C-alpha cells in the first residue's frame, strides 16, 4: 500500500514539474479559415462550393437509400 502511495505521489510530482507545452521548434505557419489555404487545400470559395455539393449529394443518397424515397420525390 505504501509503495502505491509513493508511486502516485511521484507521478504527481513528475507531471507537475514537466512542462508539456515545451516541444520542438515548429516552423509551421498558421493556415486555415482565417488565413491562406493550407497546402493541398483549395481556396475558400472553391472549398465551400465543393462541400455544399458533397452535402447535397449525401442528403439525396440518405433520402434514397436510407429513407426509401423514390427518385422522383428527391
From Swiss-Prot:
What keywords would UniProt list here?
Answer: Signal
GO cellular component terms, alphabetically, are:
extracellular region
Which N-terminal residues, if any, form the signal peptide?
A: 1-23
Select a single GO molecular function from the record's annotations and give it. bioadhesive activity
Gene Ontology BP terms: puparial adhesion
Q: What is this protein called?
A: Salivary glue protein Sgs-7
- What is the native source organism of this protein? Drosophila melanogaster
Its ancestry begins with: Eukaryota, Metazoa, Ecdysozoa, Arthropoda, Hexapoda
Amino acid at each position: 500500500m505504501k509503495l502505491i502511495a509513493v508511486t502516485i505521489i511521484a507521478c504527481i510530482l513528475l507531471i507537475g514539474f514537466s512542462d508539456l507545452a515545451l516541444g520542438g521548434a515548429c516552423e509551421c505557419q498558421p493556415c486555415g479559415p482565417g488565413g491562406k489555404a493550407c497546402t493541398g487545400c483549395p481556396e475558400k470559395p472553391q472549398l465551400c462550393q465543393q462541400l455544399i455539393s458533397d452535402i447535397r449529394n449525401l442528403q439525396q443518397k440518405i433520402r434514397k437509400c436510407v429513407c426509401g424515397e423514390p427518385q422522383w420525390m428527391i
